C-alpha cells in the first residue's frame, strides 16, 4: 500500500479538507503533515485558534487519516524521504517543493477555505 502525505494546517476544519482526505485515502495509507503553531504564526501572521495538539486530535478522528506528524509550512522531497512517504497529495493551490512525479493534485472545493471562514467569522 502506498504511503500518502497530505499537508495541511486545519486551523478551521471544513468539508473541503474532508474531501481531500477521502481522495487521498483512495490512494493509500494517509499521514497528515500538520503545520506547527509557530509556522502558522510566521506565515499567516496569527496564532491558530486551535493549538497543534487539539488540531492533531481532530485530524486523527477523521476516518481517512491514519497518522499525524508535525511539519513546517513547506514540504520538500527530503521530508517525504525522511518519513518514508511515496506521494504528497495537495489541493491545486500547491506551493511545496516536491517533484511532480511524487505529487498528486486535486481541485479545491469551490466556495470554501479556512481563510474565507475566518473572514466570515471575524469580520
Located regions from the model:
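Nucleotidyltransferase catalytic core that binds NTPs
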Residues: 1-123
Amino acid at each position: 500500500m502506498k504511503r500518502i502525505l497530505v499537508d495541511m494546517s486545519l486551523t478551521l476544519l471544513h468539508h473541503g479538507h474532508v474531501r481531500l482526505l477521502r481522495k487521498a485515502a483512495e490512494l493509500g495509507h494517509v499521514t497528515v503533515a500538520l503545520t506547527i503553531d509557530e509556522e502558522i504564526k510566521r506565515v499567516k501572521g496569527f496564532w491558530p485558534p486551535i493549538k497543534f495538539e487539539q488540531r492533531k486530535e481532530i485530524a486523527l478522528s477523521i476516518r481517512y487519516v491514519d497518522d499525524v506528524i508535525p511539519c513546517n509550512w513547506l514540504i520538500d522531497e527530503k521530508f517525504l524521504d525522511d518519513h518514508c512517504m511515496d506521494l504528497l497529495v495537495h489541493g491545486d493551490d500547491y506551493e511545496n517543493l516536491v517533484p511532480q512525479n511524487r505529487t498528486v493534485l486535486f481541485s479545491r472545493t469551490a466556495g470554501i477555505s479556512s481563510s474565507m471562514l475566518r473572514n466570515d467569522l471575524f469580520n
